[in-house]
């Protein structure tokens, strides 16, 4: 089996015991299986939930807290307990672990996003096993990842993973709830995530987790768009992750055909960047960009909205108002208003400018 880069996401329900603490048995089972992946020569990144579930009982809560301050306090206690347990277990296999705590804002800021990319690359090159969790103790509720499902998809794209394995307490996707319907049909393979498939997944999470099957399907769709195939399911024993790579996993495989990966810069533009303004273009420019992969030039710009600086991301629309994509603009809004509609040869070189593209095709993403 060729060396692969694997991202494994383990949810709260697959880690915590019935009382809310860390299940030593389950955690040891996961670590043994992850160590087997490393033993087979694969690079592994672990996305783990469980900080809140691990910490709430230590603070005296009888059950998982429902308030934001309660959840964040539990996460502050539980994250250290969770990491300590992982580190001790991985040490038995001679594996060095590294902790990264991320929030949504880390992805929206280009510099921090690039730093995360560089750090993960160096850790993997050094044969360490990165363990990533959302920084639950400071995350804003409206900016969370959904039990780390979406975080796992975004990280899998960031590191150009070959596969994302989302492990949960359900063995795959069904056409109806298998716990309530004996005739529920299981999907063993899905070539893509369609609207019909998305509608089958419920929103409810488990008692100890916040991400239901809907968030896992959404994560799978995002991972596929980034060129990463996905497995959603469950399993036990040391060989469970290796079995997934062999096509013998107990769950649903999603889009396991080779995909074209998206470059890091374009991932950031497409999924994480904040839009600072809007550029309207004529029909000729829209066709050149979308159908022929050309850069956007000032001649095709018909209107500029907002106040943005050089390097900020802007949305591009047709004269009918249809959004066709977004990209990093090489002009400020003020500069672009001065040169919109002009031919390149008619524009005076300003400052250190060496090119006239408004948005270069390498910094453009179609929507």
Curated annotation (Swiss-Prot):
Binding sites annotated in the UniProt record for substrate: 49, 136, 148
EC primary class: transferase
Coiled coil: none
GO molecular function annotation: ATP binding; glutamate 5-kinase activity; RNA binding
Catalytic reactions of this protein: L-glutamate + ATP = L-glutamyl 5-phosphate + ADP
Domain PUA residue range list: 276-350
Pathway assignment: Amino-acid biosynthesis; L-proline biosynthesis; L-glutamate 5-semialdehyde from L-glutamate: step 1/2
GO BP terms, alphabetized: L-proline biosynthetic process
CDD domains associated with the record: AAK_G5K_ProB (cd04242), PUA_G5K (cd21157)
UniProt keyword annotation of Transferase present: yes
Keywords: Amino-acid biosynthesis, ATP-binding, Cytoplasm, Kinase, Nucleotide-binding, Proline biosynthesis, Transferase
Main location: cytoplasm
Subcellular location: Cytoplasm
Cellular compartments per GO CC: cytosol
Record EC number: 2.7.2.11
Known function: Catalyzes the transfer of a phosphate group to glutamate to form L-glutamate 5-phosphate.
Family per record: Belongs to the glutamate 5-kinase family.
Protein name: Glutamate 5-kinase
Source species of the chain: Bacillus cereus (strain G9842)
């Amino acid at each position: 089996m060729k060396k692969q880069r694997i991202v494994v996401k383990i949810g709260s329900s697959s880690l915590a015991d019935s009382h809310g603490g860390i299940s030593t048995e389950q955690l040891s089972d996961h670590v043994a299986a992850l160590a087997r992946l490393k033993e087979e020569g694969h690079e592994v990144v672990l996305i783990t939930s469980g900080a809140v579930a691990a910490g709430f009982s230590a603070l005296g809560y009888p059950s998982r807290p429902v308030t934001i301050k309660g959840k964040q306090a539990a996460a502050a206690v539980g994250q250290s307990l969770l990491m300590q347990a992982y580190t001790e277990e991985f040490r038995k296999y001679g594996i060095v672990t590294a902790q990264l705590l991320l929030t949504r804002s880390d992805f929206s800021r280009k510099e921090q996003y690039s730093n995360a990319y560089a750090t993960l690359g160096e850790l993997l090159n050094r044969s360490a096993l990165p363990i990533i969790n959302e920084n639950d103790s400071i995350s804003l509720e409206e900016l969370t990842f959904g039990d780390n499902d979406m975080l796992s998809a975004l990280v899998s794209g960031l590191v150009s993973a070959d596969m994302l394995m989302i492990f949960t307490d359900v063995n795959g996707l069904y056409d109806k709830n298998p716990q309530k319907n004996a005739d529920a049909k299981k999907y063993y393979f899905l070539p893509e995530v369609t609207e019909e498939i998305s509608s089958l997944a419920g929103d409810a999470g488990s008692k100890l987790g916040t991400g239901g099957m809907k968030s896992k399907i959404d994560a799978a769709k995002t991972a596929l768009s980034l060129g990463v195939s996905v497995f959603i399911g469950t399993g036990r024993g040391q060989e469970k992750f290796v079995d997934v790579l062999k096509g013998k996993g107990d769950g649903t495989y999603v889009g396991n055909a080779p995909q074209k990966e998206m470059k890091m810069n374009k991932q950031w533009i497409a999924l994480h960047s904040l839009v600072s303004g809007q550029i309207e273009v004529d029909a000729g420019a829209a066709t050149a960009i979308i159908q022929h992969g050309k850069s956007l030039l000032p001649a095709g710009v018909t209107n500029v909205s907002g106040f943005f600086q050089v390097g900020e991301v802007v949305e591009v629309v047709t004269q009918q108002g249809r959004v066709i994509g977004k990209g990093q603009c090489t002009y400020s809004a003020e500069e672009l208003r001065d040169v919109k509609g002009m031919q390149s040869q008619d524009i005076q070189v300003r400052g250190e400018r060496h090119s006239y593209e408004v948005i270069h095709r390498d910094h453009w993403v179609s929507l």
